Amino acid sequence: MDSIFDLDHLYRTYFKMALPSVFGLMVSVVYNLADTFFIAQSNDTALIAGVSLCAPVFTALMAFGNIYGQGGSSLISRLLGQDDREGTGRVSSFCFYVALTTGVVLAALMMLFRVPLLGILGATAETMPHAQAYYTVLAIGAPATVLNFIHSNLVRCEGMATQSMIGSIGGTVINIILDPILITAVGWGAGGAAIATIVGYLCSDLYFLWLLHKKSRCLSVKLSQCHVTGRELQQILGVGVTAALSNLMQSLTVIEMNQFLLPYGNDKIAAMGIASKVSMIAQLVLVGFSFGGIPLFGYLYGAKKRDVMRKLIRFCLTFLVSIAVVLSLILCLNSGALMRLFVQDAGMIATGAQMLRWQVYTAAFGGVILLLTVLFQATGKIIPSFLLSISRQGVVFLLALVVCVHLFQYQGVLMAQAVADILSAALALGLLAASRDIIAKQ
């Protein structure tokens, strides 16, 4: 079988896959911070809060993209391990066209239910104009956003991690260029920020389409290949829906946290919005290194190379925990200075710095959860994937939030995620220990 991965140099191959993913996501962090910076320069708390309230909308669109992006790439990686090139073409084409259709349907539904959804997000009379402007553009651009997460996942599973990074960086650079023009110079505020985001995604989508059409050896977007078997559909949805649940739970987390912060004022929601964006520095580095292992985990599982997989799992866990501890220390020690880059109000700086520290205290536990979640997704383990998808930012978080708020009031809102991280990491390690066919010796 003609392997697409160099398994003789396992760690080098892992970093070859992971580093472009990390770099691409770090550019995404730069964009998010730039976006936040330009919005925060308005010194308009209602504007900052209004845009922050719409964060779950973006996460929800990501979730729908990941149903077919992560679900499809997980299956494709295993098919590549089995040297089934015909199957990879069919699955990739199916995922592309179903995702496009999903994006169009979502756009229509989001516009139809715009007002009630904005109410659920927590928009008030003060923040509604800004939230509605941002939300409307995101809704119209839903197909472009959903497709972007399909493309970036699919090209990585064929080993084109660098090309995936180029696509992500290209769209983000366009986004960053447009931000100051549309937000400040043209004066479109929240709507301008959203337009910049969607235009960036459109440009990235066009690049990925060209890449799949001209450069891919195994993937396809030909309509004639848009069909899968019942078993393949079950595998795509089994992994993809659990991956999407993780994103949807993240949206629910933000909504619930904002609802609990609402009695304390819009300044608390605005500060949390900024702190969450800054904490993404650590989170997305961990996501990048975790996602870098997906093609390898899926390939090794499909090729039944269990000893090599166990070696890679041990290495990745050690590496991720180490880098998480370092990033956590850096962000904690510089929390005030980082908040000061975005706002000058002393009260908001102090509030945001405390929020940021709580967001990253347990980054090492988050790294363990991320890696084991993608491991279960890559190997098609639906039940463990499902349990982890609804734990850290779902059921476990909501329980932690209710209990912590009851015991510590405002401080409980801030510490809930840290408590959920510790409990969910314990669950993840327990599930790994129970997954004999992944960790068993050959």
What are these regions (language model features)?
Residues 69, 137-156, 164-172, 193-206, ...:
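Short runs within selected transmembrane alpha-helices of multi-pass transporters and secretion channels
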